């Protein structure tokens, strides 16, 4: 049984990922593994000779010549949790085919001092990311003569992720936000603001939901934007979260709408009009919104839950920004398998994947 992915646990490690680069968007284009070179030493292999690491949060530079992503090294067998590798930020230069860990080039910052995820480029060779380093919060504590410990989330389970920026070489790290829960998936908008997903699960604003916020790149101007009273807008009243925002060419925002936990990583691509609405049923001026005005599904016939649909399931997606209104998506074809041992079929076909039909989706034997 697959352990569900939990959006409230961004530090989760799911070994088995590899980052590939295709030379062009065609089925027969050459595919190159650009991440495994980071772990070329045999010491990274497990007892079965497997190289099991994890990759997430891919983004590109403005000129398309560099890639940023987060990567976590293989687990150290028999090591305590505090001695395990953390999520680190890596950069791949497409022109030179070189891979580097951002903090490897610095003298004052250790890569393993915190989990670093969701990196993206800022103008001027700076990098925006979210991290458990909490550099400013630690500095304040030290100035007060206290231990510079990183804050835990309100459940006291894991260290809280907050927004940070740094130079391209990993120097001059600055903490932007101080949420007791997690601040995730920051992006720079065309208006110069930073848009991100905030888990509001502490204090007076607590609603145990992930909502959209904005902030200036210098840490000023924190502002709530959307979602606080819209978490029941999923299929069949599912409690959904607004994750991984992206700016569209028309100025609207696209998000991945999904429940906190998902066994399939499935999400509903959703377009939101932040200029005029603060919730699915509420305009900025306080008037009621007609259904479909504030938020609209980008792809019809898919849900925000793990439930199979005839149109399959969508995971990650990104707009192409070429005027075509197209998206690059990860998509899983709808498939079912027989589950009823009394079904009238060859026993050899029991449990084998089959293409979906409406009849099979409605059947109790699949």
Where are these regions (language model features)?
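Residue-level detector of Asp-centered blade-edge/turn motifs that repeat once per structural unit
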Residues: 62-63, 122-124, 189-191, 248-250, ...
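Multi-bladed beta-propeller domains
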Residues: 26-53, 95-114, 167-181, 219-240, ...
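Beta-propeller domains
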Residues: 2-49, 73-97, 151-154
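Beta-rich catalytic cores
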Residues: 15, 54-56, 63, 85, ...
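Conserved core beta-strand positions within WD40 beta-propeller blades
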Residues: 66, 126-127, 193-194, 252, ...
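Asp-box/WD-like beta-propeller blade repeats and closely related beta-sheet repeat scaffolds
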Residues: 75, 80-162, 171-184
